[in-house]
């Protein structure tokens, strides 16, 4: 696993009314600070949103509906996992929070129609000077297709 990337298992609290899942708390060891929360939805499966990286911003990703394949590439030259590539699948069926530190390129592909992701960022998005560098989805030689197993 890329250094500082975390996959946190979340525990649904279930009773006769339904369920509640705590996604992120200020007291969590993987929380740094709050900037903003936004919802991203993909209407059709196989929609790819990749790649970008931040210099300062931390991301916390939670799939609230459907499932997604995430690709992560460590671009931090001083990291012991520099250039390492990780693939992770996050799904509503096994609630998890994906923690992505600055300096790690990341992207995702929806695996189901109407996949929805709640994304929390440590910084407020600055439209005039965004903390992001974007590269094409086929960068790093990454293969987005789903392999038959």
Question: Which residues are covered by each model-predicted region?
Answer:
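Non-catalytic, conserved peripheral segments adjacent to functional cores
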Residues: 1-94, 112-149
